[in-house]
A protein has these predicted regions:
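Alpha-helical transmembrane bundles and membrane-interface segments of multipass inner-membrane proteins
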Residues: 1-155
């Protein structure tokens, strides 16, 4: 069963990597492609900093910081895999690790992260941000770890 979580983390990494490769084929200045319903669109963006454009121009520091965080996630992932039950936490760390590895790989290999999902909502700040699948994996993983820990602490 432990191997299943490892395979899922690697599968999430591969899925995001494959989507990013497809997105990279889009012309640089191409218009945003609205998805059905108009709530989100696809447009390629190279992010040379962190979320929200912070720390731009400091990729070496971002890579070191991201590497340390990813190593910590990997350590927690390995630790939680040794525990009985805790399926929600295991799944959460699986998503966290798959997403973190994909974004770290981009930063190390290309010097930027490829983002491509932009929302169209009533919230201006959300509309300014651009995401990739790994970002959603990381968010989902964090929620699952939190829920799993909450459930485990109530026992």
């Amino acid at each position: 069963m432990k191997l299943l979580y490892v395979q899922l983390a690697l599968g999430l990494f591969q899925l995001d990597h494959a989507v990013k490769q497809e997105i990279e084929q889009l012309p640089e200045q191409e218009e945003e492609h609205l998805l059905p319903g108009g709530l989100a669109g696809i447009k390629r963006l190279h992010k040379y900093g962190t979320a929200g454009g912070h720390a731009r121009g400091h990729m070496d520091k971002i890579i070191r910081w991201s590497g340390c965080v990813t190593a910590g996630i990997a350590a927690m992932f390995a630790w939680v895999l040794t525990k009985p039950d805790r399926k929600m936490e295991k799944t959460g760390y699986t998503f966290l690790l798959g997403g973190a590895l994909s974004n770290l790989y981009d930063r190390c290999r290309k010097g930027y992260v490829t983002d491509y999902i932009r929302f169209h909502s009533p919230w201006k700040r959300l509309n300014e941000l651009v995401f990739n699948l790994s970002d959603f994996f990381i968010m989902a993983g964090a929620v699952l770890v939190w829920l799993g820990r909450e459930g485990h602490s109530r026992r």
